[in-house]
Amino acid sequence: SSPSLTAQVGGMYLPSVGGVADPNALYVVWGGGNDVRTGDPAVLTNSVPNIVNIISALAAAGATNFLVPNLPNIGLTPEAQAGGPAVVAGATFLSVTFNGQLIAATAGLRSSLGVNIIDLDVYAFLNTTIANAGALGITNTTGRCYSGTTGIGGPGTVCANPNEYVFWDGIHPTAAAHALLGNYASSAIPVPAAAWLFVSGIAALGALRRKAA
């Protein structure tokens, strides 16, 4: 399995840079998706605290600039939809719960650590993307383009028009949706962005397939 975000930062990234984070980098810290996917509210107990610890560790190492996306509505993913109304409702509830805890936590970190934190509202982004799908060239907002097992190298079939889908598989976005999200994230970074020339992605969209924290 993939290493947790905590392991990625404390066991991989920081040792690789001698424990000194780049103060001019923009650190993207994104997690929680797999915790929500469990459907178990108890799993969320440590989700946001772990993200707080990750940001605190990076800040202690010298990082000053962070982009912290929240979670999309996991209830909108093909995986959740296939589970039926109860699974959808549970995933939506946990997504909202996690996001509420996260926004409160980042507000506290700004004050306690004195760092720059940009909150990226991916929940709103996905809702808006689906609502405006036609104008964006998207024709399928609920299905999965790839029909095989989630993961790398698994057997399966691919749809003929992946750029018209929001979801690649049961949980991950397509390249087209990734591009839209990238533009959205870029627009959230204040000018002058030139001050943050290097982006260090502690977790990108793949966060949904990794353990959250």
Each model region followed by its residue ranges:
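A recurrent domain-boundary module in secreted/ectodomain proteins
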Residues: G170-A188
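Short, charged juxtamembrane terminal tails flanking transmembrane helices
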Residues: R210-A213
